[in-house]
Design a protein with these regions (language model features):
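Residues forming the flavin
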Residues: 1-427
Length: 427
């Protein structure tokens, strides 16, 4: 069951001409796609490459939904595609496989007050700097300070902001930060060759093909200055941000006046990913990343048959790794659909109906919904008792029901007590 939210625009009639958002009077809403550095209207297309390329009305900011007035987009639409009467729909689809690719969120700069996050407008995240660099971004590719729109001459990048910090609750490495910081620093130098770029880092983890050479190029050819050490404080002085930190290689403290500070904040699982994992009976770790069936042999499969993983929902990874994993997941799905019959593991639970007392404790603990209730009848057709029955098509052989059974009437096929004892006696 899929909830399709109402967009209040008829996809069959809309041609994507853009007249509606050009005429919309509500124009100062922070844009999610531009990381809240730019603005959008109350009717908008989420991003230029959206599929379908049809706008959606933000009902929380639309004057019609707030006050019952306006309707300008409806009046100017040449195809009469605006439909304020639309409602959310529940769509039911029968599918043979599911690929979970929920993506990730980045930690917000506001969570790092000691680094100026939330206090200074010119302290931004790497994602925001990415949008500033883009020619279709809020500044049309010009590197300008968010506070006063002046050109940036000195920029300081701070790596591992939130990553590998136990007190922030994120002990893992975000994996992508070292490389995108090097990329951002190089792009800044390309756009402003006379500008200065500094990078504070703890360790450079450039473990991919050509990654180490890329970082060396940033240092040796582009003149990016790397300082190994932590930043202790950021404060304002004479209209600039002063970054105070340590250079552990020289054993000195440094202060750098900067126009812009970019925080390489940690990545974490997408909000709501745990809820989705629970719906599909997929386990996840303490950080919220979904668990694969086997880290080496079955890296894109899960404990639930027919459910596969792709991208950062499984662990932090960059674009090449995400594409490779998505291709592997798609191949697994095609392999699943290529045969007329589906294979399953023989190690499924089986119930001894003669000893089952019908307490159904197993039913409540089964994460896959494989336990069903079965009526046992005599020769006359009268119901003698109701017992548990395992659907072998759904059972994954996890053994949760075996542990929960009070009368010890459930076993895993191939692992019954008498079979295990026989194997031991044969040694």
């Amino acid at each position: 069951r899929i909830r399709k939210k109402a967009r209040y625009v008829d996809e069959r009639k809309c041609t994507g001409c853009g007249l509606c958002w050009l005429k919309c009077p509500v124009k100062r809403i922070p844009s999610e796609f531009d990381a809240f550095l730019g603005t959008r209207t109350a009717i908008y297309t989420p991003f230029p490459q959206a599929v379908p390329n049809v706008p959606v009305i933000d009902r929380e900011n639309c004057l019609f939904f707030k006050r019952g007035t306006c309707r300008i987009c409806e009046k100017v639409c040449p195809t009469k595609a605006i439909s304020y009467e639309q409602e959310d729909e529940i769509i039911e689809e029968m599918v043979g496989a599911v690929v979970l690719a929920t993506g990730y969120d980045v930690m917000d700069a506001d969570e790092f007050g000691e680094l100026g996050g939330g206090r200074f407008k010119d302290v931004i995240t790497g994602l925001q700097f990415e949008r500033i660099l883009s020619s279709s971004g809020p500044t049309s590719g010009k590197i300008l300070r968010p506070s006063d729109k002046k050109e940036v001459e000195t920029v300081v990048f701070i790596s591992c902001v939130g990553s590998r910090e136990r007190y922030k609750g994120i002990e893992y490495c975000s994996k992508i930060c070292c490389m995108y910081v090097a990329k951002h620093a190089m792009l800044f130098k390309h756009k402003n060759p006379k500008g200065k770029a500094y990078v504070f880092y703890m360790d450079i983890r450039a473990g991919g093909k050509g990654y180490e050479e890329f970082v060396r190029r940033a240092i040796e050819e582009e003149g990016v200055i790397y300082l190994r050490g932590r930043v202790s404080r950021i404060y304002e002085r004479d209209g600039k941000l002063v970054v105070r930190g340590a250079d552990s290689l020289s054993g000195t403290q440094v202060e750098i006046p900067a126009d812009l500070v970019v925080l390489a904040t940690a990545i974490r699982p997408k909000e709501g990913a745990e809820s989705i994992a629970q719906k599909f009976h997929v386990s996840y770790d303490s950080h919220g990343f979904m668990n694969e069936l086997h880290p080496k042999l079955r890296p894109v499969e899960t404990a639930t048959a027919g459910v596969f993983l792709a991208g950062v929902c499984q662990a932090p990874k960059d674009i090449p790794d995400s594409v490779a994993q998505a291709s592997a997941a798609a191949s697994k799905v095609l392999a699943l659909f290529s045969s007329d019959e589906l294979e399953r593991e023989p190690t499924v639970a089986i119930v001894d109906e003669s000893t089952c007392v019908g307490c159904f404790a197993c039913e409540s603990v089964c994460p896959f919904g494989a336990i069903e209730r079965k009526e046992v009848r005599d020769r006359a057709g009268n119901v003698i008792k109701v017992v548990s029955h395992v659907n072998p098509g759904l059972c994954q052989g996890c053994g949760a029901c075996v542990v929960a059974c009070r009368s010890q009437c459930i076993d895993i096929e191939g692992y019954r007590s008498e079979e295990v004892f026989a194997e031991i006696m044969a040694l």
